Amino acid sequence: MPPTNKANSKKGLTLPGYNYLGPFNSLFAGAPVNKADAAARKHDFGYSDLLKEGKNPYLYFNTHDQNLIDELKDDTSFGGKLARGVFQIKKALAPALPGTSKGGDKALKRKLYFARSNKGAKKANREPAPSTSNQQNMEVSNDIPNDEAGNQPIELATRSVGGSGSVGGGGRGGSGVGYSTGGWTGGTIFSENIVVTKNTRQFICDIKNGHLYKSEVLNTGDTAHRQYAITTPWSYFNFNQYSSHFSPNDWQHLVNDYERFRPKAMIVRVYNLQIKQIMTDGAMGTVYNNDLTAGMHIFCDGDHRYPYVQHPWDDQCMPELPNSIWELPQYAYIPAPISVVDNNTTNTVEEHLLKGVPLYMLENSDHEVLRTGESTEFTFNFGDCEWIENNITFSMPQMMYNPLVRSRRIYSYSGPNNQTSNAFQNAALRTSNWMSGPGIARGTHNATLQTQSAGALVTMVTNGADVSGVGAVRVGYSTDPIYGGQQPDSDLLRLRYSASAAEGQQNPILENAARHTFTREARTKLITGSNGADGNYKEWWMLPNQMWDSAPISRYNPIWVKVPRVNRKTLLDTQDGSIPMSHPPGTIFIKLARIPVPGNGDSFLNIYVTGQVSCEVVWEVEKRGTKNWRPEYMHSATNMSVDAYTINNAGVYAGAVQNADVMQTRFNHHKVL
């Protein structure tokens, strides 16, 4: 930055309003205008000293550059941010002047002991993956409280996260073998407007499919439920379940104290990686050795360019217990219904369809390759997604009137001799503008065998379909349940679930209460006879002026569901209460590097990776209060099973045992319509 001629008093190419912030300026241009300008002048004198020593400070990152970055790290002025950003880029790209540290001294010293050191230059943030969504930065520092130690959650207080629907990765390098790249984070922080959940799990990922992509037909023994799938060598993380983020006590606190909540931001860190090689020795048996040169591929599909398979209610989400080992699921997707491609050798239509079926290779994307001791992170902003409403009412929209005041509305009726008569409406039975919510109250999901029915509603395509001896209902894709805002004809139609789908465990069947608010599950009837006979509407379609509330959720519910990319849709109202999102968090994919072994055909090293993954979620919450005089119901252990959320003498954990244990929403917080 210093000019070649100190006597020159010109400002050079300084930033407007500054005396020293910019190249080719004088060292004696008057008093600095602010902190950034003063740091720039000090920086110029440092450059001048290096030039006197015969060193070129312009082509090499040097101590004076680092000092400028440090001095301006808290400067929020435009000039301060600009100067800091310029020299951070220089730090990342330019070689260091001999004798200058980039913050990687410890790693450089460790290269004498380890196969690979992690230099500080690796810490430069990479650009986030481009996103199809709007980029809207969100500062969350104002309302985030401190934890018990007085610390704010990891970096949430000092950084902005990516725009809605975008997930960016930044390789942060690491400290090498034997040095931690992050600690264990856990617990939940509650405040008036913000709740922060912090969770860490130990994960393990091994080689999938022998590093191959395969086209497979699954469930071949069951003609009705075969699936044409592409299985891949990749695995992925799935954070889409409330029990992964909230402990039972934290969830009780959330639903008892807050009337509505929604996710706002999420940070995922993958760190403390350990890649190990599995070796079999006749004398020693199986040996697990650290592999310091093997790599783990990782990236986030922030644009959703690959098939999104995080279906609501999937098992293998982040485990509920923090001490559980998370075995990551293998990534596979369904490129087309099997009914339209299974007979492609004899059916011309299916042959043409199969020619157009896509194939996705995840290696077709830029991504990081991390080694033992390294780390990375991804951020996401949920934007203005829907709220989870957590209130109830004992009134219906049709009851919003004063029963003591007469109505001016007239109703007509047929009197004696078919003469039309008119009268004022009864004060207790006056008409309303509002109708109950839509839904289909009937269905056939009551077969004795699961293979005899895929659900109450089934969607399938018939072009080229030839499934011999199998009814369409058994090969279609189910929408279930579908009663919407109406009360179902049968309890068999109700949404039921389990806390886990793990084999060898007791998995009690759970469901949310049928009605804890009078704005759902109505029964719409039509008066069909002069004597007052009525009949139920089995199919109550969407009409103007329908009023209903969203479905309640529980701790075991999924958080979001991805809205398909179509250009026509009706009102989004999920039956299970999950939040519909056009751009949910992108899938974070990982796999082991394929390291060939010479002379053994297509052989490769047998390795696996384990490490920690932490997930911090910022939740926006609201407390509205109520004018209700009477006490309200609260979720309490008094009404729960004695075995709920306990561990037995064999170390087996029991989650929710009965319906009261799931602590559903819409249980309290009375509202006025």
From Swiss-Prot:
InterPro entries: Capsid/spike_ssDNA_virus (IPR016184), Parvovirus_coat (IPR001403), Phospholipase_A2-like (IPR013607), VP1/VP2 (IPR036952)
Renumbered ranges of motif Nuclear localization signal: 623-634
Catalysed reaction equations from the record: a 1,2-diacyl-sn-glycero-3-phosphocholine + H2O = a 1-acyl-sn-glycero-3-phosphocholine + a fatty acid + H(+)
Compositionally biased spans, kind Polar residues: 130-144
Region (Phospholipase A2-like) residue spans: 13-68
Molecular function via GO: metal ion binding; phospholipase A2 activity; structural molecule activity
Pfam family for this entry, one: Parvo_coat
Gene Ontology CC: one annotated term: T=1 icosahedral viral capsid
Gene3D superfamilies membership: Parvovirus coat protein VP1/VP2
GO biological process: clathrin-dependent endocytosis of virus by host cell; lipid catabolic process; microtubule-dependent intracellular transport of viral material towards nucleus; symbiont entry into host cell via permeabilization of host membrane; viral penetration into host nucleus; virion attachment to host cell
Family: Belongs to the parvoviridae capsid protein family.
Domain notes: The N-terminus of Isoform Minor capsid protein VP1, VP1u, contains a phospholipase A2-like region. VP1u may play a role in the disruption of host tight junctions in the airway tract. A nuclear localization signal is present in the C-terminus and can be recognized by cellular nuclear import molecules. After assembly, it is hidden because it is on the inner capsid surface.
Name of the protein: Minor capsid protein VP1
Organism annotation: Bovine parvovirus 1 (BPV-1)
